[in-house]
Amino acid sequence: MRLNTLSPAAGSKRVKHRPGRGIGSGLGKTGGRGVKGQTSRSGGGKVRNGFEGGQMPLKIRLPKFGFFSRKSLVSAEVRLNEIALVEGDVVDVSTLKQAGVITKNIVFAKVVLSGNIDRAVTVRGLSVTKGARAAIEAAGGKIEE
């Protein structure tokens, strides 16, 4: 056995396709690109999202509606079981931030009924749903507006 006589086993290496090199290759003439059109051209086929070939795009044909509430960027929901993470008896926006329940950019928070609360807390300066209010008061807590 010599290094110059080594060769891979028959059938173990696939022959690389060479498009556009004659009809016998199976990829002659059009080279597997089909006939005419944007994707058959060199550099073709890459168009931006929503582009419809010059036709008026659907996004522009439909009417505008609604808006994006900027208050939603500074508002958050707080669950009852997250209030348990706050140390102390008073729960407000600053204590929720210190406990890591809400992020620093939050200005408004609303307490919702999800989970349960087992200790008396005073909720100050937060919106509270009916169900959450009942659960907090049942645990001996109170809500201050």
From Swiss-Prot:
Record has RNA-binding as a keyword: yes
Compositional bias ranges of the Gly residues kind: 21-35, 42-52
GO biological process: translation
Coiled-coil zones: none
Disulfides per UniProt: none
SUPFAM superfamilies documented for this protein: Ribosomal proteins L15p and L18e (SSF52080)
GO MF terms, alphabetically ordered: rRNA binding; structural constituent of ribosome
Keywords tagged on the record: Ribonucleoprotein, Ribosomal protein, RNA-binding, rRNA-binding
One Pfam family cited in the UniProt record for this chain: Ribosomal_L27A
UniProt GO cellular component terms: cytosolic large ribosomal subunit
InterPro entries (alphabetical): Ribosomal_uL15 (IPR030878), Ribosomal_uL15/eL18 (IPR021131), Ribosomal_uL15/eL18_sf (IPR036227), Ribosomal_uL15_bac-type (IPR005749), Ribosomal_uL15_CS (IPR001196)
Region (Disordered): 1-52
Annotated function: Binds to the 23S rRNA.
Family: Belongs to the universal ribosomal protein uL15 family.
Quaternary state and interactors: Part of the 50S ribosomal subunit.
UniProt protein name: Large ribosomal subunit protein uL15
Species this protein is from: Aeromonas hydrophila subsp. hydrophila (strain ATCC 7966 / DSM 30187 / BCRC 13018 / CCUG 14551 / JCM 1027 / KCTC 2358 / NCIMB 9240 / NCTC 8049)
Gene that encodes it: rplO
